[in-house]
Amino acid sequence: PEDPRSYYSVARRLNKEIPNSFYPNQYDNLSNAQAHYETTGPEIWKDTEGRITHYAAGVGTGGSMCGTAKYLKEQNPNLITVGLDTYGSVFKKYKETGIFDEKEIYPYLTEGIGEDILPKNVDFSLIDHFIKVTDKDAAVMTRRLAREEGLFVGWSCVSAVHGALEYAKEHLKEGDVLVIILPDHGTRYLGKVYN
């Protein structure tokens, strides 16, 4: 994140250089999670008529996962949340051990989930479990979702679907309601995973 070429650094630099620009800082600006607390959480609760038992989402900035999870857990403290992570990210190990292990950090292809930092929007107390998904498993699921379901979604979304399905195989029982949000479209991946 401190490398001047990183997107974190470039965004900060551009904000300083461009008059009247705005740097939303989606990682540490708690308005990110608050927006999902006020909108996404209530929408899911209403649309499932309060029957949701499990909520799964990719974790990158933490906003959609944690803002939504906070609202849903206030409605149902027994709700289980599953964060989807990628190999090369620190989230899962940090949740399980409390240790920020730099050995967990290495390059990966999946965009939109996983990080080599701990954003302020990631509230680990709101995430019950983490599942890691490989780049390959996500890529395979990308094509499967497009063919079988007609869903043209981004790489992080298919990681969430793959991870949630893996979790569901072992943990869900009849009557459970699992909601996964898919906040990314596939157009930006035409030259990547869809190529």
Mark where each language-model region is.
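Gly/Ser-rich phosphate-binding catalytic loop and adjacent alpha/beta segment
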Residues: P1-L14
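Active-site/ligand-binding-proximal alpha/beta "capping" segment
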Residues: I18-V59, K70, F124, D128, ...
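Short glycine/serine/threonine-rich phosphate/pyrophosphate-binding segments
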Residues: G58-T68, F91, S156-A164
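Surface-exposed amphipathic alpha-helices with a cationic face
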Residues: A69-N76, A168
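Phosphate-binding loop/pocket of nucleotide- and phosphate-handling active sites
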Residues: P107, K120, H162-N195
